Amino acid sequence: MLVSWAVPKGPSLDPKEKRLAMAVEDHPLDYARFEGVIPAGEYGGGTVMVWDIGTYDLEDDGSFDSAMRRGRLVFALHGRKLKGGWTLVRTGGRKWLLMKRKDRSASTADVTTNKPRSVLTRRLLAGIARDEGGDVARAATGDPSSIATG
């Protein structure tokens, strides 16, 4: 299973920024490579893009499960777009904060604006919606609240 969070404003490479990350339902491993449209009215309905892909390493002592119970995950990402140190801190219920740690991959550049394409197909959200029969106008806005968390 993929433990998953929705980050409505997308990740920030700026260590001064804190981004809301909402814990969502765990996803099957197959979802790591799913792009397409989930019909409106179904869970996660909307256009789904694989925006980044990679691996992670926990940087805390202890297991992933113990870090989840504590509500603090300290990890490094080794993705095509996101790299370096990150921290997720639970603030209550399903609400977490995602923060970039200060390291050589930190930046004030807006990574979601500068790198908007799928890492699998190089399509934009609107292109995925068009190709898969989804709502192109809604996907074209890039509004993260209109994007399924997959």
Regions found by a protein language model. Name each.
Residues M1-G150:
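Catalytic cores of nucleic-acid ligases and guanylyltransferases
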